[in-house]
Amino acid sequence: EMERVHWAYVTVHSPCQLANPVLVHEKSYIDGKWVNALNGQTQPVYNKATNEVLAEVVDQGRQDTEMAIKAAEEAFQTWSKTTPHERHNYLLALFAKIQENAEDFARLIVAENGKAISDARGEVNYANSYVQWFAEEALRIQGYTTPSPNPSNRTTVIRQPVGVAALIAPWNFPLAMITRKVAPALAAGCTTVVKAPHEAPLSALALAYLAEEAGIPKGVINVLVSSRGKNESEMGKALCESTLVDKLSSVSYTHLTLPTICSV
């Protein structure tokens, strides 16, 4: 059996040593709470260099997914009514939190994803650039009015948030491909349900923790984790079938394309 690494005792030479070890979470984040899987199941996350077990994270299914979707739908009722300036400030606060913990994020990515530390640091900067960019874009969500063929009419376009966005992230950029989806959704006034990659879910859970620290309200960001197989299929099917999900975005695995998710 693989030895489980206790984060507090990782050697100084290890890329896993974190200045802020509270970033590491094994539970999922739903409606502002850290929760176990309703089925009681867990799954290991391995250090890709040593094959040691870094953490035992939750392994969730359909019921957990439906709970997260409901939380996002309820949060949408208030989040969608926030002003662009409020959403701008929330995203800037998250940007600052990620900046403060950039080196820890890089080390976490090295451990769970396996890329070199230089690449991991680049990913963190890349990931946070989306948060910064869409913080500013929140202020520029504007409608417009154009002339109509009928001189007595005008055509007016009003931009409104879609609703709950279900976001499926890949393993190869476990932080950047999540901020790339979450940041514009939040800027637009949408709430989110994130399916973290089961091979490398710790970055997504750390992001949820920092979002909480940044003051982002409960239910606006929800993060789920499932293993490859039955639970993942149940989760994908729940995301596709829910009438409360208004947007589905996936940068996905070869075995987990959107048609595959929605047909299982």
Residue ranges and their predicted role:
Residues 30, 44, 56-67, 215-220, ...:
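Histidine- and aromatic-rich ligand-binding microenvironments
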Residues 143-256:
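Rossmann-like NAD(P) dinucleotide-binding subdomain of oxidoreductase/dehydrogenase enzymes
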Residues 2-56, 89, 93, 125, ...:
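Terminal low-complexity tails and localization/encapsulation signals of metabolic enzymes
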Residues 44, 56, 108, 119, ...:
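Conserved beta-strand positions that form and line the central face of beta-propeller blades
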